[in-house]
Amino acid sequence: MLKERPAWANNHSAYARNHNSNPHMMPTTKTTPMVRSEHPIDPTVRERIIAEIDAIERAHGVQVLYACESGSRGWGFASPDSDYDVRFLYVHPLDWYLRVEPQRDVIEKPIDDELDVSGWELRKALQLLHRSNPTLLEWLNSPVVYRQDAHIMSDLRGLAPSFFYPIKGRHHYLSMAKKNFRGYLQDETVRYKKYLYVLRPLLAVRWIDAGKGMPPMRFAELVAGTVDDHALLSEIDELLAIKMRAGEAEYGPRRPAIHAFIEAMLAEADHDPQYKQPQGDPADLDRFLHRVVCG
């Protein structure tokens, strides 16, 4: 049974530490200098996003349980011209789940110059959680939340860690890092944002290999938990400053310290440690789905 949606927080502050933040994120222990991190959400765009979510609910007859930012605004290093990557989870009324033929389980809005909006149906999301899908796990820990059913999402986040399989996360992030490094960082002049698109997944691999569990979505938190070299931290922070003040297409000469670190990390990560299978029980996901759909 679909429940009435609670009143949603509507704070427009730019930083992840305030009410735009996901309240379920673990706090970062500051043992080394922190790199900069900003999550700018224009109040006018936020209102437009909420209006889009409302329109999706009306057009498709669904309830959006959760909507968050999934791209650079969630990672904490958006450029002035970065778009908004909005991702959401939704549930249908009970009748939808009682049909013999499979139904479409994705909703996608046409991409425009500002918004990229798409979402997954809850059963699909739970199937992906059972398979330890890193993308879904990142969504659940986004520091920028546009809407959520607090009770349902608290329960879902409580289930998620038991389904995290380190080797799957490791393969996902290492593949992402290699693809971006080989595709964009081989010339003497490089697109600076691609450094961050390699550093983020490589540090996620380091986080996993350190036994810390699912890597955080916030890049600053990821750096704080995996990098303690002050010179390297300064290099990363300078790279972030360039990314945040320049456009998405900013090019410049290679940054030798960052480049050397990436090459060393790729060599270091090119192995498969032994990890235990996740201990999550799929019956818990079945019960969760039943509770949300049937009330």
Regions found by a protein language model. Name each.
Residues 71-112:
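Catalytic metal-binding acidic patch
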Residues 276-295:
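Acidic, carboxylate-rich catalytic segments that either coordinate divalent cations
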Residues 154-281:
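Conserved nucleotidyltransferase catalytic core and NTase-mimicking acidic/glycine-rich helix/loop elements
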Residues 99-178:
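A basic- and aromatic-enriched beta-loop-alpha substructure that forms the phosphate/nucleotide-
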